């Protein structure tokens, strides 16, 4: 595996093949462990303590940017102003990495929760006016349905409306492109089925210069708990059984293949590898040198 970690950068960087990837932290979500499901409170406390995590545990919100064949690619867009005061740093981080929002040509969306798409907006305008937003067809159909706000529980309506608002200027400008699982979105980047957390949750498998990497979105929210208990999900999962199956499938594949992993909610910069350890997995942050 070809991966190096930028030791002197003010933010995390890694090299996959010949391409440098910058990790961008949009912010931190507090008390995410309180949203975990299928685990008793006492067991949760034990798991957090054993992993050295705070109780309740917070979760970073990571996105990634890189240049590929003359295109500037952003994986997820953070929460922006949709989730104040905890998020909204992504555009500033992007500039620190040497990119202007106007340079971004493609945004790969793992799923359309607000902490991944809210940052598409700058006020009411497109934060990335020259970008095409790529999202799974079923995911877009679900979240952009005009009937969804009325069908949803009242406490979720503000977030749903924020999600729809974030995509609206891009859809109006014909800058949303949908895909199906298995599609090659950009050269060497393939959309893969990880549905369960949301209807069209997607992981992106990237094959570049003999190296392979996986952007796994929200497979894991609290690493210290879920790597050991793959059946533990969150109350935001659209299908807890499907989400657990996706976790098992993609963690096992990551460990087996030795992929570089980029995790949206893994400890910043969210770059590492996965190692099988009996019936569960361990996260190894940073570089893995062949």
Positions of the model-derived regions?
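Metallo-beta-lactamase
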Residues: 15, 88, 95-99, 103, ...
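Divalent metal-coordination and catalytic microenvironments
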Residues: 18, 66, 75-76, 104, ...
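Active-site metal-binding loops of divalent metal-dependent hydrolases
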Residues: 26-27, 77-80, 112, 138-139, ...
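Cap/insert and terminal regions of metallo-dependent hydrolase folds
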Residues: 205, 209-290
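Active-site metal-binding motif and surrounding structural segment of the metallo-beta-lactamase
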Residues: 69-71, 84-134
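Bacterial Sec-dependent signal peptides at the C-terminal "C-region" and cleavage site
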Residues: 3-11
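Active-site environment of divalent metal-dependent phosphoester hydrolases
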Residues: 32, 112-119, 142, 184, ...
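Conserved beta-strand hairpin/beta-sheet module of binuclear metal-dependent hydrolase folds
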Residues: 10-97, 203-220
């Amino acid at each position: 595996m070809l991966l190096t970690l930028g030791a002197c950068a003010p933010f995390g960087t890694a090299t996959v093949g010949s391409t440098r990837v910058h990790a961008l932290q949009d912010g931190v979500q507090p008390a995410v462990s309180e949203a975990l499901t299928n685990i008793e409170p006492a067991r949760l406390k034990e798991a957090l303590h054993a992993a050295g995590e705070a109780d309740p545990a917070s979760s970073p919100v990571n996105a990634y940017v890189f240049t590929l064949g003359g295109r500037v690619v952003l994986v997820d867009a953070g929460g922006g102003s949709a989730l104040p005061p905890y998020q909204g740093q992504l555009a500033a981080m992007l500039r620190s990495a040497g990119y202007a929002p106007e340079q971004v040509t493609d945004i790969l969306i793992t799923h359309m929760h607000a902490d991944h798409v809210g940052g598409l907006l700058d006020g009411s305008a497109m934060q990335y006016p020259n970008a095409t937003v790529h999202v799974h067809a079923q995911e877009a159909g679900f979240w952009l349905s005009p009937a969804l706000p009325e069908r949803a529980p009242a406490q979720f309506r503000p977030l749903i409306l924020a999600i729809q608002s974030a995509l609206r200027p891009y859809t109006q400008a014909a800058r949303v492109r949908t895909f199906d699982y298995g599609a090659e979105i950009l050269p060497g980047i393939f959309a893969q089925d990880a549905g369960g957390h949301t209807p069209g949750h997607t992981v992106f498998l990237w094959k570049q210069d003999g190296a392979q990497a996986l952007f796994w979105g929200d497979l894991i929210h609290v690493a210290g708990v879920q790597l050991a208990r793959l059946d533990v999900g969150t109350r935001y999962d659209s299908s807890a059984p499907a989400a657990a199956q996706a976790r098992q499938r993609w963690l096992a594949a990551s460990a087996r293949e030795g992929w570089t992993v980029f995790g949206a909610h893994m400890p910043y910069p969210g770059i590492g590898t996965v190692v099988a350890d009996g019936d569960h997995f361990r996260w190894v942050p940073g570089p893995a040198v062949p």
